[in-house]
Amino acid sequence: MIEADRLIHAEPQGIEERDEQIDRAMRPKMLDEYTGQDDSRAQLKIFIQAAQNRDEALDHMLIYGPPGLGKTTLAMIVANEMGVNIKSTSGPVLEKAGDLAALLTNLEPGDVLFIDEIHRLSSVVEEILYPAMEDYQLDIMIGEGPAARSIKLDLPPFTLIGATTRAGALTSPLRARFGIPLRLEFYNVKDLSSIVTRSANVLELPIDEAGAIELARRSRGTPRIANRLLRRVRDFAEVKHDGEITKQVAELALDMLDIDSEGFDYMDRKLLLAIIDKFMGGPVGLDNLAAAIGEERETIEDVLEPFLIQQGFIQRTPRGRIATDRAYRHFDIIQPEK
């Protein structure tokens, strides 16, 4: 789908090795370097210190929220703070029970196992996780047919960190086994401008405060998008200007990239205008809306909608999606009386 080609797409994208190295360099390594998410950060600091004082593995943690807010980064920070190794995988990759068993049996005491998109685990793999999380035991079947038998293997104490954009899609038994649930929220402009400034310093890129704020304002409250836009605005600044990112340079670059003052690109505008023009402002059902804009319903629900709802441009009602007054004002369209 065209969603994956969006510059402001918050999911990770296939990028060149150089950009991947830059992304890694821009990531904070410790909690003190991590900006925003103040409540979650404060809680995590206490939980980590308590686990270290007791010389225990940190309790299992579920990090959830919209894409691009730093779930993977936070998992790496936890491992760094605890001074342990981290092994990373994702739900769709773990197809068989043996895939998970291989990871679990190679963990050292206190290690972190990070599973991204944990809501996409198969039921077979999930069953293996239950005793591993609760009792640090692995139940596996040896042999087949009448000769098959179950054996238990002891595992070292470890921390499972699951990340998901859809916490509601987790089964209740799995969700209940996470002792530390952390919800990440969209970032405010102040925190996001601090992240932009820090990333610019890592890149040795001159940027003034107004330029960082303008970039932050159009980044949809999402650090991954902010860092991606920073790289593209850097290209513009180096080719068209003297290399420094000022407010004017940021505005010109982002306008050229078709990202408007609210951080919307053509897909956001297409979605909002479909509700306004094709469905008279709504309400409109998700399936009809997906067909109207040629996008998958999951993409609308998980990627496009959250920010638009949080910013007050769309309301989600039992009867469907409705465009708000703010959406009409954004396009200078007079809202019809109902």
Curated annotation (Swiss-Prot):
SMART domains: AAA. Residues 4-187 are annotated as: Large ATPase domain (RuvB-L). Its EC number is 3.6.4.-. Residues 188-258 are annotated as: Small ATPAse domain (RuvB-S). GO terms for molecular function: ATP binding; ATP hydrolysis activity; four-way junction DNA binding; four-way junction helicase activity. It catalyses: ATP + H2O = ADP + phosphate + H(+). Its main location: cytoplasm. GO terms for cellular component: cytoplasm; Holliday junction resolvase complex. The keyword rRNA-binding does not apply. DNA binds at residues 297, 316, 321. InterPro entries: AAA+_ATPase, AAA_lid_4, DNA_helicase_Holl-junc_RuvB, P-loop_NTPase, RuvB-like_N, RuvB_C, WH-like_DNA-bd_sf, WH_DNA-bd_sf. It is an enzyme of class 3 (hydrolase). ATP binds at residues 27, 68, 71-73, 134-136, 177, 187, 224. It is found in: Cytoplasm. Keywords: ATP-binding, Cytoplasm, DNA damage, DNA recombination, DNA repair, DNA-binding, Hydrolase, Nucleotide-binding. The keyword Hydrolase applies. The RuvA-RuvB-RuvC complex processes Holliday junction (HJ) DNA during genetic recombination and DNA repair, while the RuvA-RuvB complex plays an important role in the rescue of blocked DNA replication forks via replication fork reversal (RFR). RuvA specifically binds to HJ cruciform DNA, conferring on it an open structure. The RuvB hexamer acts as an ATP-dependent pump, pulling dsDNA into and through the RuvAB complex. RuvB forms 2 homohexamers on either side of HJ DNA bound by 1 or 2 RuvA tetramers; 4 subunits per hexamer contact DNA at a time. Homohexamer. Forms an RuvA(8)-RuvB(12)-Holliday junction (HJ) complex. HJ DNA is sandwiched between 2 RuvA tetramers; dsDNA enters through RuvA and exits via RuvB. An RuvB hexamer assembles on each DNA strand where it exits the tetramer. Each RuvB hexamer is contacted by two RuvA subunits (via domain III) on 2 adjacent RuvB subunits; this complex drives branch migration. In the full resolvosome a probable DNA-RuvA(4)-RuvB(12)-RuvC(2) complex forms which resolves the HJ. Belongs to the RuvB family. This is Holliday junction branch migration complex subunit RuvB. It comes from Shewanella woodyi (strain ATCC 51908 / MS32). The gene is ruvB.
